[in-house]
Amino acid sequence: MEIPRRHFLHLAGGAAAAAAFSNLAAALDYPNRPVRFVVAFFAGSLSDILARSIAPSLSKRLGQEVIVDDQPGAGGNLATDIVVRASSDGYTLLEATSANVWNAALYDGLNFDFIRDIAPVASISRTPAVLTVTT
């Protein structure tokens, strides 16, 4: 049986609208549980301090607890891998640094493609790097 083009377009449009609105309905409930904020460096590092300074205001704004989770190692690759493997539901955030971008060139066999698998949400700081000498 052949479906007329016009009828097919109406069905396709209806299906697309239903899919879009089902995602919207799910998004209206976000967040309904704590959010995990993964940091790729040790406790006390600049990245950790930044995450811990942002977490309270982010928690207040979202109306849910934001848990800072330090996962240091392999230049940020361990933390990135944890986030990439998590559900893409917005409940697992990664504090990314320039190291994350460089890692693709530095390490062979990563289980992820940082550009493809991670989506930027917001810029949270700009930290200059300074070359110094003793005086």
Regions found by a protein language model. Give the residues of each.
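N-terminal signal peptide c-region/cleavage motif recognized by signal peptidases
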Residues: A20-S22
